[in-house]
From Swiss-Prot:
Family: Belongs to the UvrC family.
Protein name, as recorded: UvrABC system protein C
Organism the protein comes from: Salmonella typhimurium (strain LT2 / SGSC1412 / ATCC 700720)
Keywords, sorted A to Z: Cytoplasm, DNA damage, DNA excision, DNA repair, Excision nuclease, SOS response
Protein encoded by which gene: uvrC
GO biological process, one term: nucleotide-excision repair
Domain of life: Bacteria
Subunit structure: Interacts with UvrB in an incision complex.
Length: 610
């Protein structure tokens, strides 16, 4: 028990109402957040002589201060608890690491609706279908829908400013509502309705309506129209035959759990309108000594209740673990959704088979993860031995990317004991240097990264500098000049020079900018982890550079044309739907853009052609 914290005096001030408590250590950091139906009873349990677990003993030993927030109801306490966990990320709470909102397919409420992928808050007017497990699943579905139901997927800024149909119309992937006369309002609305029914799982209704239209077209001797509808019917059938369909209208999440070697995997299977949309595995951060029940309860609460998740709640949640707070969770979710949400732990029939599938997927994913973690642990231990360090808990690597000195981007990737920590990857746009000066770029990114206060847990044990002696010299110079409150001598700076012909396995490592470097055997686990983090850094830098280059690509060609300033450039791109549309436009079409004279249109036309 904490020698500093006066638990007896504190407990005299605590109410027996429901609420949330936050525990702080001596440094003022929140180390645990909890909720209680009876705050006094719950908090008293921490200060008994016989505590339930070593984890609780370790927690109590660090308590310096406790804050209490009283709430009106248990539901309010549950919601507040998970918001605090998300805000403070306490080390003794089970933490959901992946906090990204799931993507949906969005059908807009425009006169001519469009299909698009959407993440986040649902402010735009329209309909949302999902959630899908990842962006790839949404893009794949959108591509499929475009082939079967050719409604537009272009941005409104492009749609409103087109004077002729785009390539999607030419290849039959869009009906071209942007240009009057290409498609009737009735036909476009009919295709939109098919999409709505299809995404709602009502494939039979889509097929029934299409078959009726095909038969009518045949009776009217409109054989081309009948053939087009026949192709559409066949496309819908091909898709629906591949899908596993459960009981019609099922709308549920199925959660399976696996737990081994102190690591948990929670696998979520998404079923909407009776179809399996996909699944995703989660590996929540689990403090040592945590029971599986706490892992599951905390995960489920964070997964559905944290405010920014923006999840669409299903009608039913299936679990393979009996929660002590199942009724409270169901009531809280129902209150949020404005309808009844059922939490089921002992399903039968199809639902039991779903649960078995989720459990099997969780176990498989956990085995794979443990194998990968074992590999990364071995590699980091080998590298620590090579570098004569007791352990490597955190490692950061930097790389620079540019094209002929333009659009320079620096990347920083982070590895911890479990491997890549992608949530902490960063890119830095480099400015104010001589184009192509990689040394100046490295100098700038290191000052921006380390020339400020850093939490103790975020100080890296090793900093890898991709580029060899010269870049290592820059890093050493930067660290020599740093005036920061943290221990700048703690990170080991290590230069990595690529081998002959940039072949993997021939890298040279440098502790100092002067003198000879050293190499590791090609089969060395220590070398493998260096190659891994260096490649991650390189890919991250290249990705950022390509995005930056693509951003300026649309405008760079126009910047060289006399008489075309920023406003006219923006108007041209907006009116023509992008640079490609402008390249394909005639002089007469360019001259129709507001603010563009016939003479300037000719100049733009010939400049883009030559």
């Amino acid at each position: 028990m904490s020698e500093i914290f006066d638990a007896k005096a504190f407990l005299k001030t605590v109410t027996s109402q429901p609420g949330v408590y936050r525990m702080y250590d001596a440094g003022g950091t929140v180390i645990y957040v909890g909720k209680a139906k009876d705050l006094k009873k719950r908090l008293s349990s921490y200060f008994r002589s016989n505590l339930a677990s070593r984890k609780t003993e370790a927690l109590v030993a660090q308590i310096q201060h406790i804050d209490v927030t009283v709430t009106h109801t248990e539901t309010e306490a549950l919601l507040l608890e998970h918001n605090y966990i998300k805000l403070y990320q306490p080390r003794y709470n089970v933490l959901l690491r992946d906090d990204k909102s799931y993507p949906f397919i969005f059908l807009s409420g425009d006169t001519h609706p469009r299909l698009a992928m959407h993440r986040g808050a649902k402010h735009a007017k329209g309909e949302y279908f999902g959630p899908f497990p990842n962006g790839y699943a949404v893009r794949e579905t959108l591509a499929l829908l475009q082939k079967i139901f050719p409604i537009r997927q272009c941005e409104n800024s492009v749609y409103r400013n087109r004077s002729r149909p785009c390539l999607q119309y030419q290849i039959g992937r869009c009906l071209g509502p942007c240009v009057a006369g290409l498609v009737s309002e009735e036909e476009y609305a009919q295709q939109v309705e098919y999409v709505r029914l299809f995404l709602s799982g009502k494939d039979d209704q889509v097929l029934t309506q299409l078959i009726a239209r095909m038969e009518k077209a045949s009776q009217d001797l409109a054989f081309e129209e009948a053939a087009r509808i026949r192709d559409q019917i066949q496309a819908v059938r091909r898709v629906t035959e591949k899908q596993f369909v459960s009981n019609a209208g099922d709308d549920l999440d199925v959660i399976g759990v696996a737990f081994d070697a102190g690591m948990a995997c929670v696998h979520v299977l998404f079923i909407r309108q009776g179809k399996v949309l996909g699944s995703r595995s989660y590996f929540p951060k689990v403090p040592g000594g945590t029971e599986l029940g706490e892992v599951v309860e905390t995960f489920v609460g964070q997964f559905y209740l944290q405010g920014s998740q923006m999840r669409t709640l299903p009608g039913e949640i299936l679990l393979d673990f009996n929660l002590s707070d199942k009724t409270l969770l169901a009531d809280s979710l129902s209150e949020l959704a404005g309808r009844r949400i059922h939490v089921q732990t002992k399903p039968r029939g199809d639902r039991a088979r779903y649960l078995k599938l989720a459990r099997t997927n969780a176990a498989t994913a956990l085995i794979t993860k443990l194998s990968q973690q074992s590999t990364i642990t071995q590699r980091l231990s080998a590298l620590a031995a090579v570098l004569k360090l007791p352990a490597i808990k955190r490692m950061e690597c930097f790389d620079i990317s540019h094209t002929m000195g333009e659009q320079t981007v620096a990347s920083c990737v982070v590895f911890d004991a479990n491997g890549p920590l992608r949530a902490e990857y960063r890119r830095y746009n480099i400015a104010g240097i001589t184009p192509g000066d990689d040394y100046a770029a490295m100098n700038q990114v290191l000052r921006r990264r380390y020339g400020k206060a850093i939490e103790e847990s975020k100080i890296p044990d090793v900093i890898l500098i991709d580029g060899g002696k010269g870049q290592l010299a820059q890093a050493k110079a930067v660290f020599a000049e740093l005036d920061v409150p943290w221990d700048k001598h703690r990170p080991l700076l290590l230069g990595v020079a690529k081998g002959a012909d940039r072949k993997a396995g021939l890298e040279t490592l440098f502790f100092e900018p002067e003198g000879e470097g050293f190499s590791l055997p090609p089969d060395s686990p220590a070398l493998h982890v260096i190659q891994h983090i260096r490649d991650e850094s390189h890919d991250h830098a290249i990705g950022g550079h390509r995005k930056k280059r693509a951003k300026v690509k649309n405008t760079s060609t126009l910047e060289t044309i006399e008489g075309v300033g920023p406003k006219r450039r923006q108007m041209l791109l907006k009116y023509m739907g992008g640079l490609q549309g402008l390249r394909n436009a005639s002089v007469e079409e360019i001259a129709k853009v507001p603010g563009i004279s016939q003479g300037l249109a000719e100049k733009i036309f010939w400049s883009l052609k030559h």
